[in-house]
Design a protein with these regions (language model features):
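Active-site proximal loop and beta-alpha junction motif in alpha/beta enzyme cores
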Residues: 3-92, 97-284
Length: 284
């Protein structure tokens, strides 16, 4: 793939790996583009590449840690990781972090079983198990009960039993069937800086969810960062720390989740879809 971007690069080649995270099989889970860089490119170039990739998130990383990162938690491989949607840079993305760990631990450091990532959300860690699963360690995110926003309820077309706000807006429904049947009008969502999560007790897992946000990808296939908020909620309501979860998007995804103090551990598999090269060509 050749992309004309602002700047002077000659014909700089950048590897691109598309990896499905939280995937039971090919064509499931959430795809992320993973792009290792020798050094950071200008932010506008990163944004253009993410827009061209047109996936929910593109993960860019470099082995060059910024001075304010401090020391990584251990001596395992550590990189500086950033996430971009097709529209803007974001503060946290679980599935793209897991996908990046899979690429690093499979391609660059096959003898290691842990990778650290310095991000806008601080240090994150992913471990690889003996069964080739990946364990993503995220900060547990709080939620506060609120009165449901009538405009949001109307746009989602659901009848929530409960509404909470935090990193995302959460509407708790009565059943898995209601979550599965929901047909939100995402374009009618009120102006929100956050995503909207529909969740309920599950028939096929301890809890289920779907994640919506206006933009290039209105429904996210599997959202690791949303589970950093959902796991503390459901662990408290169900009275146990170890939970199973399903995200009921068209692609679908399964997660095993643990609330460990102020951290959330998410376990899933990764499937590599493609490896390629992007040529950043000077515009003509």
């Amino acid at each position: 793939v050749s992309i004309g971007v602002a700047g002077t690069f000659g014909n700089m080649e950048v590897l691109l790996h598309q990896i499905d995270a939280f995937a039971d099989a090919p064509f499931t889970g959430n795809p992320a583009a993973v792009m290792p860089l020798p050094q950071w490119l200008p932010d506008d170039v990163l944004q253009q590449v993410a827009a061209e990739n047109n996936l929910a998130e593109t993960a860019f990383y470099t082995a060059l840690l910024p001075p304010h990162a401090g020391r990584a938690p251990t001596d395992d491989p550590a990189v500086h990781l950033r996430w971009f949607t097709p529209e803007h840079e974001i503060d946290l993305c679980g599935h793209a972090t897991m996908a990046t760990a899979a690429q690093i631990l499979e391609d660059i450091h096959p003898g290691a079983d842990r990778a650290h990532f310095f991000t806008r959300s601080g240090w994150l860690t992913v471990e690889r198990t003996d069964d080739d699963e990946y364990v993503l360690d995220l900060p547990a995110l709080p939620s506060v009960d609120v009165v449901p926003d009538p405009a949001l309820v109307a746009a989602t077309g659901v009848r929530p039993l409960r509404a909470l706000t935090g990193q995302d807006e959460v509407l708790v429904l009565a059943s898995e069937a209601e979550v599965r049947a929901a047909r939100p009008n995402v374009a009618a969502f009120p102006a929100l800086p956050r995503g909207v999560v529909l969740t309920a007790p599950g028939d096929t897992a301890d809890f289920v969810s779907r994640f919506f946000k206006p933009g290039a990808v209105p429904e996210d296939p599997v959202t690791g960062s949303a589970h950093a908020q959902l796991v503390p909620l459901w662990a408290r309501d169900l009275g146990r720390a170890d939970l199973t979860a399903r995200q009921l998007s068209a692609r679908g995804g399964r997660l095993r989740c643990t609330l460990a103090g102020d951290r959330v551990l998410l376990v899933g598999r990764c499937h590599r879809y493609l490896d390629g090269v992007v040529t950043l060509a000077d515009p003509v």
